[in-house]
Amino acid sequence: LDVSHGHGGVLSKRPVVLAVVSDVHCGSTLASCPPEGVRLDEGGKYLPSIVQRWLWAAWEDYWAQIRALCKAEHAALWVVLNGDSFEGQHHGTTQIVSANPEVQAYLAARIFGVPKALKPAHTFIIRGTEAHVGPSGATEEAFARSIRAERDKDSGRWSWWHLRLAIHNVRFDMQHHTSTSGNLPWTRPQAAQRLAFRIWSEHKLRDLDAPHYAFRSHRHIYSD
């Protein structure tokens, strides 16, 4: 079975573990923060809250499980960061560690250094929301270039608005934004089903093979 992406180039017959995370929001006071905190430009220091320390522990635990799975399956690791990896400075929020981009860049290096240490075979960066990552996903594009993420060969960009992968004949479809929602108690359980049907029907109307799995983020709600 072939492992391929982009236009179907053969990569490997090795098993693959695909790890997808999103909305990490590096720089938010409600996002993960390393236990040593981060030094501020003025000489002070920001230390993580109890919630942030818990998030950091959960983050490390997740990647430890991924490492164990890769080892058990003798699998290659592919990582997808599905948008809003940075918090930015938006909507007059006070819930940021610092408005200094360098502070958020340091936090991103520490936070995403955890999966980087696992030496993934491929890393894909998906662009998120303008309010968080700037016009045209500028912050995530710069970050993707800095870590030499997988490049979109068609556009030459280091990050992606829409990523389609084919891994061992299994099709994946990745975007940050979703086209449906369901916030009411009686509509929330059906949001994923509505989105699945929309994705399937849009592909069929264009005579395309629908993905086996589609990932959408942004809503901060788990639904399957």
What are these regions (language model features)?
Residues 1-103:
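N-terminal active-site segment of His-dependent metallophosphoesterases
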Residues 75, 90-92, 101-213, 219:
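Conserved catalytic scaffold of divalent metal-dependent phosphoesterases
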Residues 221-223:
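Eukaryote-biased recognition of electropositive, low-complexity segments
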Residues 84, 218-219:
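Conserved H-loop
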